[in-house]
Amino acid sequence: GSVIGCGETCLRGRCYTPGCTCDHGICKKN
């Protein structure tokens, strides 16, 4: 749920930062 350490825009649901998941177009961690 946090964008700290993530926050990248995720295209096609893919995040390149380890441990981050795509949530409504933004990569988030927990």
From Swiss-Prot:
PROSITE patterns (UniProt xref): CYCLOTIDE
GO biological process assignments: defense response to bacterium
Summary of the tissues where the protein is detected: Expressed in root nodules but not in seed.
Cross-linked residues, Cyclopeptide (Gly-Asn): G1-N30
The keyword Cell cycle appears for this protein: no
SUPFAM superfamilies in the cross-refs: Cyclotides (SSF57038)
Function: Probably participates in a plant defense mechanism. Active against Gram-negative bacterium E.coli ATCC 700926 (MIC=2.4 uM) under low-salt conditions. Not active against Gram-positive bacterium S.aureus ATCC 12600 up to a concentration of 100 uM under low-salt conditions.
Entry's free-text remark on domains: The presence of a 'disulfide through disulfide knot' structurally defines this protein as a knottin.
UniProt similarity note: Belongs to the cyclotide family.
Protein known as: Cliotide T16
Lineage of the species this protein comes from: Eukaryota, Viridiplantae, Streptophyta, Embryophyta, Tracheophyta
